[in-house]
Regions:
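Conserved small/polar residues in nucleotide/adenosyl-binding loops
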Residues: 162-164
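Structural motif
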Residues: 57-61, 103-108, 148-155
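Bacterial Sec signal peptide processing site at the extreme N-terminus
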Residues: 13-30
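Short loop/turn segments that connect beta-strands within beta-propeller blades
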Residues: 64-68, 111-115, 157-158
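Beta-strand C-termini and the immediately following turn/loop, strongest in propeller blades
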Residues: 49-55, 96-102, 141-147
Length: 164
């Protein structure tokens, strides 16, 4: 009887243990080799957007996790802009970026299909700090500083910025 109880306890304990997270050494090694440092990751489907530092300068990088290769982002990484936060849509077509440019912090939307950014004004005005783009690429959550207080704004993007 004791053996049955012990066996039953062992089955219960092993059945209740949660699976362990599985690191991806192949992808992690690739990510470490491509830049000196990387921060602010955002996953969207098969896409990983992050801020990578190379040669003392940070830039937005997009990695296609299926092909394990970086994706060109023409028109996004400007010499006069310092990215602060990035988020990618599930289809990898839109990236929302908070960046410091010409002594102001701004929120921009980058559309890969046209290779251009568009500034997104905040109403009421404030200083954006972090951004999160939903999987559909239609809505943003933005952490904003206003009058010494942190707020979160939810923004629905206009249809003209959504359609590819």
């Amino acid at each position: 009887m004791i053996r049955v109880a012990l066996l039953f306890s062992l089955v219960l304990v092993s059945g209740c243990s949660s699976p362990r997270p599985t690191p991806r050494p192949d992808l992690n090694g690739l990510l470490r080799q491509s830049v000196n440092s990387r921060r602010d990751p955002s996953l969207g489907g098969r896409w990983l957007a992050s801020l990578g530092q190379r040669n003392g300068r940070e830039r937005v990088e997009l990695i296609d996790l299926r092909s394990r290769s970086p994706v060109p982002l023409p028109g996004l990484n400007r010499a006069d802009a310092q990215p602060i936060s990035v988020s990618v849509s599930a289809d990898g077509q839109r990236l929302a970026v908070v960046q410091q440019r010409e002594d102001r912090t701004e929120l921009v939307l980058y559309r890969r299909n046209v290779g251009a950014t568009q500034r997104l004004p905040l109403d009421p005005p404030g200083v954006p700090r972090r951004v999160s783009l939903d999987g559909s690429g239609r809505r943003l959550a933005v952490q904003v500083s206003r009058n010494g207080r942190w707020d979160v704004d939810l923004i629905r993007l206009p249809l003209s910025l959504i359609h590819i």
